[in-house]
Design a protein with these regions (language model features):
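Conserved hydrolase catalytic core segment
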Residues: 94-137
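Alpha/beta-hydrolase
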Residues: 139-223, 230, 250
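Catalytic active-site module of serine/aspartate enzymes centered on a nucleophile-bearing elbow/loop
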Residues: 257-290
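Short beta-strand/loop motif that positions the catalytic acidic residue
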Residues: 228, 234-236
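Conserved acidic catalytic loop of the alpha/beta-hydrolase fold
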Residues: 78-96
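Conserved alpha/beta-hydrolase "acid-adjacent" motif
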Residues: 241-247
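Conserved HGGG/HGGXW glycine-rich cap/lid loop of the alpha/beta-hydrolase fold
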Residues: 11-67
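Acidic beta-to-alpha connecting loop that harbors the catalytic carboxylate
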Residues: 32, 238-240, 265-267
């Protein structure tokens, strides 16, 4: 493992490379409010052993990257996409496969729209298409108002917990995100939580994380998805409470030539049971996109 601090404008990003230096690069873009250490170690190892140079990094305001107050220093998903490009530049990587989970899928979609020359492929999981009024749907989940597109809102229990995270333990929150069809390894999650906290030893917990304050209207880019030429794979998680089916299918249908793969039993959580199926899907897609 090699570590490197990389500058993106006036922000410093902590980054790490795992795998053979000359292997095809795989850039990991995590979920919102998550650092590089939120990627399960077993999954990272499997991806590296499968022949990828895995690049993971701390978003701004996470881990060991630059932390600043958001209102005086606002940014949006376009800035996060530019940060991702800076990571590639910092490691001397011309092109990479971008794997995005949750918010990282939005970053990957923007990379495919605005920086397609830097990509070999994208894999999207735990996300929705850009024509979905995601932030408005949180309110609709609470009021019962129908969505603008007929697609489902996040499940009400998730929105209620997201607005009141102290009502359950962190482990219980992730247990619910994972769903009830796959084994839930509490000890593995606790180790991951401990690793995240140790990695960000100087980070003070905040109630309103900057990522949660981004309110960029990405629906303005919805029509642009039809212009994506980067080979795309969408992973469907049948038990995802944030983007329930058929969101993944709708996302795949919004991108020309995109393939859809379902991982049975998966929720909005990278449970140990999905690490090998996800690695297999990503590896096969990288081969198809090269």
């Amino acid at each position: 493992m090699r570590e490197r601090i990389i500058r993106s404008g006036d922000v410093e990003l902590w980054t790490q490379a795992i795998g053979e230096p000359d292997a095809p690069a795989l850039l990991l873009n995590a979920g919102d409010c998550q650092s590089s250490m939120d990627w399960p170690e077993d999954l990272v190892r499997l991806l590296a052993d499968a022949g990828h140079l895995v690049l993971r990094y701390d978003y701004r305001d996470t881990g060991r990257s630059t932390h600043r107050e958001f209102p005086p220093n606002p940014y949006d998903f376009d800035d996060l996409a530019r940060d991702a490009v800076a990571v590639l530049d910092g490691w001397g990587i011309e092109r990479a496969h971008s794997l995005g989970f949750g918010m990282g899928s939005a970053v990957s979609q923007l990379l495919a729209l605005d920086h397609r020359e830097r990509l070999t492929a994208i894999t999207l999981l735990g996300s929705c298409a850009m024509d979905v009024d995601f932030f408005g749907n949180w309110e609709r989940a609470l009021t019962g108002e129908p969505t603008l597109d007929g697609l489902p809102t996040p499940e009400r229990w998730f929105v209620e917990l997201a607005f009141n995270p102290a009502s359950v333990s962190e482990i219980e929150f992730y247990r619910r995100l994972s769903g009830d069809q796959l084994p839930f390894d509490e000890s593995e999650l606790q180790q991951r939580i401990d690793r995240v906290r140790a990695h960000a030893a100087d980070e003070e917990p905040v109630e309103d994380h900057p990522h949660g304050q981004i309110r960029q209207d990405w629906t303005k880019r919805a029509a642009d998805l039809a212009g994506i030429t980067t080979p795309a794979l969408v992973i469907e998680a049948p038990l995802d409470p944030i983007h329930p089916p058929p969101h993944a299918r709708h996302l795949a249908e919004s991108i020309p030539g995109a393939r859809l793969t379902t991982i049975p039993g998966m929720g909005h959580y990278l449970a140990p049971a999905i690490h090998q199926p996800l690695t297999d899907a990503v590896t096969a897609h990288v081969g198809a996109g090269m």
